[in-house]
Amino acid sequence: MNIRLILAAAAATMLAGCSSLKDGEYNLSLVTTGDGHGSWFYKPFSENGSARSSLLAQSQYVNELRAEKGADNVILVDAGDNFLGSNATFYYDYADTLSPYLYPRLASYMKYDAVAAGHCDFEAGHGVYDRAAETFRKEGIPFLAGNVVRTDNGKRYFQTGTIVKKNGVKVAILGYTNADNAALMDKSAYSGLE
């Protein structure tokens, strides 16, 4: 899973990037989410749907943490797998294929610092993850998958990482997806990529 890489990179870079700061103690909170699979809302879309963990609940937690610690002391990243798994994702994957993708707009509302692409985010194909990547770009959120490379020119398809500045501390956030994506899904979903 991407989470280990994100955490290790963030921790290592926080330490390395402190040289220009004044001596003192700096406390940053790193909040990671992932494997949401479309659980954006509190209940599924049915009369008998029961309450569940959701992006809404995560938003409440993050807002409380920011209020307690200070917004500039909280880093919020997601490890991917958000584009499949619910009626809401199905709607944006296959029914409304022209609107900006919803998850990046929700991530913008929550003020994510970066989002990595999970392997499930590729399964619905280019139409979904390319549209989501464009929506992330418009929302100003880095969408990361540094190990996804174009087969036609060998260039990276997505950003590898980003640097955020929190309370004067520069923190690098790196994002990688499952290296076996091409073997895990239909070839058309991952066409032109390796």
Stretches found by the model and what they are:
Residues 19-194:
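Acidic, metal/ion-coordinating pockets
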Residues 2-19:
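Gram-negative bacterial Sec-dependent N-terminal signal peptides
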